[in-house]
Amino acid sequence: MKIENGVAKKYRKSVDDALDAIIAQGNDDHKRVTKLILDSKMLIQVKPVSEVKASGVTGVISPWRTRGKLDEPMGLKEALGEIYICIAEETIDTGGQRGCEGTLVHEGRHAYDFAQMIESLSEADINPLKVFDPTLYELELAAHKTAGEYMLCVNRGEYINEGLDLGILGKEATGQCFVSDDGIKLRLKTNYSVTHDGDQGRLASEIVGLR
């Protein structure tokens, strides 16, 4: 992983600390994805929210360059090197470490799924039936679920409260919290206008400009 030149020291430290925390506190999937990112040449950017337009966003650094590489099989780690995650400065300024961790867990899942998509497209001539190209609904469902699972792993007040406020987590009558499939699906319908049995949105390859 590499952090873009020019990113302020405090943001670099926040990103490094967040990735360390995810490995220390997350489940096996969180650890696996984060370690893959750290071992790759994936790019991390930090920019004002006026440019990012969200707490974080994930995409392909250069779609035309990546398209040119799809003629040859590409491994997952190499594919991650085609990806960037951009975090809004305000995510760290106002959300602190929790905000940075949560964004990296969510966007890290997108980065992993985009890399899987790129890897599968590069092998499409060999394995045309194994192309992985999820819809926006599938991408966001996976990212929201992994974010909810991380909140439960950390199991501290501010993390749990954020999950409950966002509808990602639910609470049993006993007080036990859980990842809420219904809450996440409602959030996807409200915020992204996608549903399981209706419009699932564009394919990952279309979202990042590879098709």
For the regions a protein language model found, what residue spans apply to each?
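Second-shell loop/turn segments in exported
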Residues: 2-7, 19, 90-94, 98-99, ...
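Extracytoplasmic/secreted proteins, especially bacterial periplasmic and envelope-associated proteins
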Residues: 10, 14-17, 32, 99, ...
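A metal-dependent hydrolase signature that marks the N-terminal structural subdomain at the beginning
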Residues: 1-69
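Post-HEXXH active-site segment of zinc metalloproteases
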Residues: 98, 102, 114-141
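Long, well-structured alpha-helical subdomains associated
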Residues: 136, 148-211
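Residue-level detector of alpha-helical secondary structure
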Residues: 12, 16-23, 34, 38, ...
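Short active-site segment of divalent metal-dependent hydrolases/proteases
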Residues: 105, 109, 113
